[in-house]
Structure formats: structure tokens, C-alpha cells
């Protein structure tokens, strides 16, 4: 390969790199983000054990096993939803 091609490929890489790095955000757009749980669906803890694990982080910085457990505790503790996933700091 000539040095001209190497320079061209290097510049092309520098130009296209930001697009490849930020293209992941396309898939995590607002329509794909999990919304706050609909707590009217959950009435008691007994029905929570049948629901799969789907962690919810609340404003008390505790991680709840799934939406159901979060919603039941929300009534008692007046919690606010932060995001779906494990709370990353305590």
C-alpha cells in the first residue's frame, strides 16, 4: 500500500469513528427506554414472586427485585422511581 492510501484510511477512520461510537444511542432512544412501572397492576406481595427479575432502582437508592416489589414498597415508603436496573451507588 502506498502512503497516500494509508493517510486516506487514517483520515477516513478519524471521520467515521464518532458515528460508530454514537450509533449505539440510536438503539437506546426514548421509545426503547423502560418507563416507570404502572403500580395499579400490583395489589400484594404474594403475586410478586411469580414475576421475573427486572430490577428497579428507587430514590432511596435500594434495588427492588422487580416492578411488583417496588410498587408495593412505594405505597408504604412513598418511594419515587429512578430507573430500571440495579442502583449503582448507595
From Swiss-Prot:
SUPFAM superfamilies: Kazal-type serine protease inhibitors
Tissues expressing this chain: Luminal fluid and mucosal folds of the seminal vesicles (at protein level). Not detected in brain, heart, lung, liver, kidney, stomach, small intestine, muscle, skin, thymus, placenta or bladder.
Signal peptide region: 1-23
Residues annotated as glycosylated: 38
Manganese in keyword set: no
Induction and repression of expression: By testosterone.
Pfam families xrefs: Kazal_1
Keyword Secreted: yes
Key words, A-Z: Glycoprotein, Secreted, Signal
Any one of the GO CC terms: extracellular space
Residues of the Kazal-like domain: 33-89
Any one GO biological process: negative regulation of sperm capacitation
Compartments, as annotated in UniProt: Secreted
Cited PROSITE patterns: KAZAL_2 (PS51465)
Task performed by this protein: Does not function as an inhibitor of trypsin, chymotrypsin, subtilisin or elastase. Binds sperm and enhances sperm motility. May act as a decapacitation factor, suppresses BSA-stimulated sperm capacitation and blocks sperm-oocyte interactions in vitro.
Name of this protein: Serine protease inhibitor kazal-like protein, minor form
Organism listed in the record: Mus musculus
Taxon lineage: Eukaryota, Metazoa, Chordata, Craniata, Vertebrata
Amino acid at each position: 500500500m502506498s502512503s497516500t492510501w494509508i493517510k486516506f484510511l487514517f483520515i477516513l477512520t478519524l471521520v467515521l469513528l464518532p458515528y460508530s461510537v454514537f450509533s449505539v444511542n440510536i438503539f437506546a432512544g426514548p421509545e426503547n427506554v423502560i418507563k416507570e412501572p404502572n403500580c395499579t397492576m400490583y395489589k400484594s406481595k404474594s403475586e410478586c414472586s411469580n414475576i421475573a427479575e427486572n430490577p428497579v432502582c428507587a430514590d432511596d437508592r435500594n434495588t427492588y427485585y422487580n416492578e411488583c416489589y417496588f410498587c408495593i414498597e412505594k405505597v408504604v415508603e412513598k418511594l419515587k422511581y429512578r430507573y430500571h436496573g440495579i442502583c449503582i451507588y448507595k
